[in-house]
């Protein structure tokens, strides 16, 4: 089974995270940031991933360090779980509606970190979650996993729905990208490596 775990401790956060790419039954998320827990759970369920997260952070300041560091650790675990990337689709994309909102995510497991994030989040805060942290999370994942990630909110009026559509689309796009494909021999690249 393709899986990875990491514990990362800094003066700001302590993150313990385990990711299973091929087994999606066990999802448990506790970061101390309620809305973020909800989004990570949606990502895992819609991507059919196993995900266990325990995070302690300086949320008395704000949720920035916790959200960003969870993204860093998730990216590291994704990179490690994929190992040599042989036999996977490499690319994945998904449109996901959430009522009036529509989110889109496209992923290339390319070995090159890059992110494009587009979307207007009109409500600056949802519970104790600063909505601008949505982009920070995706940036952290993309950079540490060495993937190219395009995340776009096409339209919508409810900020919760917009972010939820993105996290669900992220799960579905990543599922497609990491899926093993019997028609792909070796690495899905003319270079012979990623």
UniProtKB/Swiss-Prot annotation:
- Known EC number(s)? 4.2.1.19
Biological processes annotated in GO: L-histidine biosynthetic process
Catalysed conversion reaction: D-erythro-1-(imidazol-4-yl)glycerol 3-phosphate = 3-(imidazol-4-yl)-2-oxopropyl phosphate + H2O
Q: Enumerate the subcellular locations listed in this protein's record, separating them with semicolons.
A: Cytoplasm
Q: Give, as one word, the top-level EC class.
A: lyase
Q: Which GO terms describe its cellular component?
A: cytoplasm
Q: In which pathway does it act?
A: Amino-acid biosynthesis; L-histidine biosynthesis; L-histidine from 5-phospho-alpha-D-ribose 1-diphosphate: step 6/9
Pfam families, alphabetically?
Answer: IGPD
What molecular function terms (GO) are annotated for this protein? imidazoleglycerol-phosphate dehydratase activity
Q: Which UniProt keywords apply?
A: Amino-acid biosynthesis, Cytoplasm, Histidine biosynthesis, Lyase
In terms of superkingdom, the source organism counts as Bacteria
Member of which family? Belongs to the imidazoleglycerol-phosphate dehydratase family.
Q: What is this protein called?
A: Imidazoleglycerol-phosphate dehydratase
The protein's gene is named hisB
